[in-house]
Amino acid sequence: MSPANTMSLALSSADSTLDAKAARRLARLLNPAPAFHAHLPGGAERARVEQYIAARFREVHGANIHDFMPVLLTMGCHGRTTAATGVRAAVRQPLFLEQYLSGPVEQVLGTAAGEKIRRANIAEIGNLVATQGGSSYLLFMVLTAILEQAGFDWVVFTATPQVQKVLAYLGLGVHRLCSADPGRLSESSAAEWGSYYASQPQVVAGKVADAMAVLNQRALYSSVLSLFRGQITELAEVLRRESSRRGSYILAA
């Protein structure tokens, strides 16, 4: 059965409270169905993906970013990238967003969540961009499933109001950790970020299991994730292997 036909079945069987606008948005993104890929340092397409991310940050924020996360994930169709994000395991090195925090991420997050959290179970995401309407919604859904299969319990990131809107639309709750204060940057200057900080981004964290529970409760979202089950499994294994490697990378937002 083709992805488009599968999507039609998912729409017809979705619960009655499903937002029709969300259904139409996802239907457009799935016809034709996009593909998801991981790009590691030194990979054949890595430079192109970095250029795509940098160009989008420059276009939207007037920013000049030049450092990127260890694992870059892309979403695209027919060779055209429509969204991308980066992932870094906290166990590998200090996180970029820890510059904003008052202490190690596992301690700050543990206090906010009211539970003991192991650093090895935390992933940071960043370098998030999209060039097609709605792409970020689907990317977040698939990324959540990838993180779960890769063994991460928590995800942390710096969220602009637009990213917060995506999370709210999907029904994904987060813990607010602090404001992203550019005055605390040591790895890059605020000037390099253009207008990025004018939107007052927030450092937030989400529990992966809770996010997956929300996605699985919605018939449409669950059906969409099932379409990409094979890709999710493959990308989770890439992320798991890369997270266990020794060494470190330059910090990148």
Regions found by a protein language model. Give the residues of each.
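Intrinsically disordered, low-complexity acidic/polar segments
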Residues: 94, 134, 213-215
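Conserved N-terminal entry element of GNAT/NAT acetyltransferase domains
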Residues: 1-44, 225-226
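Accessory, usually C-terminal, subdomains that scaffold auxiliary metal cofactors
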Residues: 181-231
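N-terminal short leaders/motifs
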Residues: 13-33, 75-81, 97, 153-162
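Active-site/ligand-binding-proximal alpha/beta "capping" segment
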Residues: 221-242, 253
